[in-house]
Amino acid sequence: MLEGGNEEISTIPGFNQIQFEGFCRFIDQGLTEELYKFPKIEDTDQEIEFQLFVETYQLVEPLIKERDAVYESLTYSSELYVSAGLIWKTSRDMQEQTIFIGNIPLMNSLGTSIVNGIYRIVINQILQSPGIYYRSELDHNGISVYTGTIISDWGGRLELEIDRKARIWARVSRKQKISILVLLSAMGLNLREILENVCYPEIFLSFLKDKEKKKIKSKENAILEFYQQFACVGGDPVFSESLCKELQKKFFQQRCELGRIGRRNMNRRLNLDIPQNTTFLLPRDILAAADHLIGMKFGMGILDDMNHLKNKRIRSVADLLQDQFGLALVRLENMVRGTMCGAIRHKLIPTPQNLVTSTTLTTTYESFFGLHPLSQVLDRTNPLTQIVHGRKASYLGPGGLTGRTASFRIRDIHPSHYGRICPIDTSEGINVGLIGSLAIHARIGHWGSLESPFYEISERSKKVRMLYLSPSIDEYYMVAAGNSLALNRGSQEEQVVPARYRQEFLTIEWEQVHLRSIFPFQYFSIGASLIPFIEHNDANRALMSSNMQRQAVPLSRSEKCIVGTGLECQVALDSGVPTIAEHQGKIIYTDTEKIILSGNRDTLSIPLVIYQRSNKNTCMHQKPQVSRGKCIKKGQILADGAATVGGELALGKNVLVAYMPWEGYNSEDAVLINERLVYEDIYTSFHIRKYEIHTHVTSHGPERITNEIPHLEAHLLRNLDKNGIVMLGSWVETGDILVGKLTPQMAKESSYAPEDRLLRAILGIQISISKETCLKLPIGGRGRVIDVRWIQKKGGSSYNPETIRVYISQKREIKVGDKVAGRHGNKGIVSKILPRQDMPYLQDGRPVDMVFNPLGVPSRMNVGQIFECSLGLAGGLLDRHYRIAPFDERYEQEASRKLVFSELYEASKQTANPWVFEPEYPGKSRIFDGRTGDPFEQPVIIGKPYILKLIHQVDDKIHGRCSGHYALVTQQPLRGRAKQGGQRVGEMEVWALEGFGVAHILQEMLTYKSDHIRARQEVLGTTMVGGPIPKPEDAPESFRLLVRELRSLALELNHFLVSEKNFQINRKDV
C-alpha cells in the first residue's frame, strides 16, 4: 500500500488484474450471451427440433496440471458440457442429454493461456467506438464540407455528407453516394413521415425535385435505386425477395448493427431515448443525425475529436474470446443442421450426442490462439517482460489500423491519455505510437472505456472518496495536477494550483478544484515507473529505457538496485516468478527441487522451477530462501526466481562507473569494462537452447533412432546411449550428434550389387539402404545437456510423429560485442575488456568496473543517470537503498540535487573519505590512470549506477561465411545468419572503399566473392593449390541480369572489353 498526498492510502492494483477480469467476464457473461443466441434447429420436414438448455452448462476442472501441459506440449483447458434436447413434434417426445461441446483454454495465474505447451497472451486492442462522429474537411475549393460518419459494431461505415447547396447525401462507398431521402425510403419511411420528424423540413424539401420524387414514390422503387447505386448494377433490376436479402446481408447487417456500446453512444450524441436493447440503426437515428449535420453546417454544435479516448473502446480478452465462441457456435449450428438432414435421409434415429461434435469449438480456439494477430507468444525474457506484455494496448489487428497507413496524429500523445495510456512506453520503429502500454492504475470499464482513478475533493466531508472516471466524464472537472500531492491541507487552501480542464492547463484557486490525482506514478506504465529520476530525462531516452529493461537477461547472481522507485517488489510478486507461501506454517524440509510446508494439520509440497527454458532461451530457476524448521507467515517469500532478490525485481548489477574518455575505446557509445566482471561472474548468465527432431513413417518404412550410424566418426557419436540419444550431463561441441536417426530410402537399380540384383530377381526381396538424418549440434551451440524428453506418439498413428527434445545449457560471461545499458536509455557495446591493473582507479585504490563516454549525456539530455550514479555511490558506501518517486521537485526546488549532495556529504563524513564529496566539484573526484599511476587532468564523475546486460549478445549474432547458398536469379549470396548468408556491400560501402583507393579489394567484393560464377570457382581452386588469382574477362551475373531485363523491354545492350596491349575494342556479346 502506498500513501497518496495527505492521510489517504491507495493500493496499487494487481498488474495482471485486467487479464483476470476480462477472462472472468467471458466465463460469467460472454458464454451465456452466446449460448442464448444459439437458435432452435429444425429439419427440412420440420418434424424434429434440436435446442440447447443454457441454464445448465458446466465447465469441468482440467484433468492435467499446468506444469504437465507445458512439459507434454498439451493445452491447459476445461471441457464445456451443455444440456441439449431433441424434440419429435409429431409424438411430442423429448430426448435430453448432456453433451460435450468442446474445450475452452483456461487462464492461469500469470494471466496467460497454455496452448500446445506454449504460453500465449491476448493483448488489448483499441478500436474506434461504434456511434456517430462529425468532422469537417476542406474540399479542393477551400470550402468546408461537413460529414457525419456512423460506425457500426462490425467496423462498417455509413457517411452522411452535406454539400454547398445544403443537400444531404448518404455515401455508401468511396465513389457512390445517394440522396438521404432514398436511403430513408428504402428503410420504410414515406415523405410525410420524414418531413414530420425533422427540425429543418424546408431544407429537405429544397432538394426534392421531380426525379427524386419518382425514386421515393414507393419503398420498392427506393430499394431498387439504392441497390443499383450500392451494387453498381447497370440496367433495370427487378424487385424481388432475393434482392432484399442480398441488400440486408451486404449493407444493413454490416453497416447498421450498432451493438450495445454503439446504441449508448448514439443516444448520448443525438439526445435520443431509444431502448438499449435496440442495437440496430433506425430511421429515427438517421433523421436525428441529419438534423445535427445541418446544425453543424450553420455553426451549431461541436465537431468530434476522433483521437480522443472517449471515442475509442477497448476490445479486451473477454470480447475476443466471446467472438470466437460465437463463431464456433455458428459452425456448430451448420454442422448439426447437416448431420440432422443426413440422419433423416438415411432413416437413422438421431440423438443429441450424435448430432454434436466437439472438434468445432476446440479447433476454433486453437486456431485463434495460434493465428490471431492479437494472440502472441508470451515474452518471458525476465519477470518485467511477462508483466508488461499483458498490459499492452494495440491499435493494430483485425478492424484496426496498419503500421504503414496510420497517420502521425493517431500516433501522437493525446491529453485524454493522462492516467490511462503511458505517454512514454511505446514500441520503436514502424509501430511507434500504435502499440502503447496501460498506465499503472488504468482499468477497463463496463462499456469498454479506459478509466482512471481520482480523489474527489469535498468541502463538506473531510473523507476523500476515490472515483474511477471514463475519458468522457473527467474533462468536465477541474483536475489538480500532480504537484498538489505534496501540499498539506493548510497550505493548499492559500495557494493557487495548476489544474487540467477540457484538455487545457489552467492556474486556479484550491477551492475550485474538483478532483486530484492519487499517485505520482499514475500517468506511467510499469516500465517507465521503474526509472529513477525519470523527470530529468528526455522522453525519447525514457522510452528506450522502458523498452531495454524488458530485454535484460536474468543473471546468475542477481543484485538489488541501490537506487529504485519502490515498484520493484510489486512487479516481482505479480510476475509469479518468486514462490510465495499461500498459508502460514513451518518448513519441515527443503532442497533444490521442493519445499515441504506443514500447517493447518496438513502438509503441502511446493515444487520449484529448476533450469527451465524460457522462449527467449533465458534460464528460469528458483532458489529456496527459507531454511528447515523456520516458521513462516502467509505471503512470505519461500523461493526467489530468475532476476528477483528477496521478492524484489533485480535485473542488473550495481557497478562502479567512471564517465571519461579512455584512448578512444569508449567513443560512440562503446563501453570499456574491467576483467573483474568476467572472472568474478558479475555479468554471467545461463542460456538454455532447445533442439528437437521428429521421426516419421515414410513410404519406404519408419525412421529409426539408433546409435549405429554408418560412415560417421566414433568421436561424433561418443555421447550417445544405447538408444541413440545423447546422455544427460554430456558436454557437447559443435557438430556432435545429439540424436542418431536413419531414414530408409530405396536405392537406384544401377547402384545394386550383382548378388542383390539376383536375390531381387529370384525372391522378390526389396533391398533398401538408409540415409543418415541425425540431429547435429549447430554452430555456437556448445554446452551441457541438462534434459532429454522423448515424447511418444499415442495410439500408434503415423500422423503423430515421435518427438525428441534435447535441452542444452550454456554459461555465458560478458564479452566484447555484448550490449549493456543503464535505466536512462544509455546503451553501449562492450569494446574492450581491460586488465584490472590498467583500469582507472579511485583514491582508495579501487579500480572502476566500467568507463562510459561523457559525451553521451549532454546531447541526449538523460541527466537522470548522473543523479543515479552519484546517489548509488553514496548508497554503496553507506550500505543504504533508496526508493525515490518521480517528480520530487514538487516538494521543493532542486530536491533531487539536494538529496544526492546531502547523501554524498554524509558518506564522505562516515567513511572519512573527503574525495567522495569535494565542494569545488561535488559529485566528481580525482582519479588515477592505472597504467602510469598519474592523476587525470580533470576531475571525473564516478558512481554506482544499475547496469543491465541485454539479450542482444555477440554469441547469437557473430557470423562468418566461407561458401554457401546463392540466390537463383542474381547468383549473389543469400542474406542473414540463419541462411548462412553473406555481408552486403551497398552503395555507401562502395563509396567508402573508393575513397581509400582499394581497387583490388573492391573488385573482389563485387565479382569473385559475389556473383561472378566462373571466377569464384577458379578462385577456390587457386586458393587450394596456390598461385595468382585469375582475372575474369566476362561480366558478373548481376550485369547480365540487367542486360536481360533491358532486352525484355526491347533494348539491346552490349559491353566491350578493352585489351591492355593494343587498346583495340573487341566486341563481345553478353
From Swiss-Prot:
Statement: the UniProt record of this protein carries the keyword Repressor: no
GO molecular function: DNA binding; DNA-directed RNA polymerase activity; ribonucleoside binding
Keyword terms of this UniProt record: Chloroplast, DNA-directed RNA polymerase, Nucleotidyltransferase, Plastid, Transcription, Transferase
Function of the protein: DNA-dependent RNA polymerase catalyzes the transcription of DNA into RNA using the four ribonucleoside triphosphates as substrates.
Entries under Pfam families matching the protein: RNA_pol_Rpb2_2, RNA_pol_Rpb2_3, RNA_pol_Rpb2_6, RNA_pol_Rpb2_7
Superkingdom of the organism of origin: Eukaryota
Catalytic class of the enzyme: transferase
Subunit record text: In plastids the minimal PEP RNA polymerase catalytic core is composed of four subunits: alpha, beta, beta', and beta''. When a (nuclear-encoded) sigma factor is associated with the core the holoenzyme is formed, which can initiate transcription.
Taxonomic placement: Eukaryota, Viridiplantae, Streptophyta, Embryophyta, Tracheophyta
Organism (species): Morus indica
Similarity comment text for this entry: Belongs to the RNA polymerase beta chain family.
Catalytic activity: RNA(n) + a ribonucleoside 5'-triphosphate = RNA(n+1) + diphosphate
Protein name according to UniProt: DNA-directed RNA polymerase subunit beta
GO cellular component annotations of the record: chloroplast; DNA-directed RNA polymerase complex; mitochondrion
InterPro entries: DNA-dir_RNA_pol_bsu_ext_1_sf, DNA-dir_RNA_pol_su2, DNA-dir_RNAP_su2_dom, DNA-dir_RNAP_su2_hyb_sf, RNA_pol_bsu_bac, RNA_pol_bsu_CS, RNA_pol_Rpb2_2, RNA_pol_Rpb2_2_sf
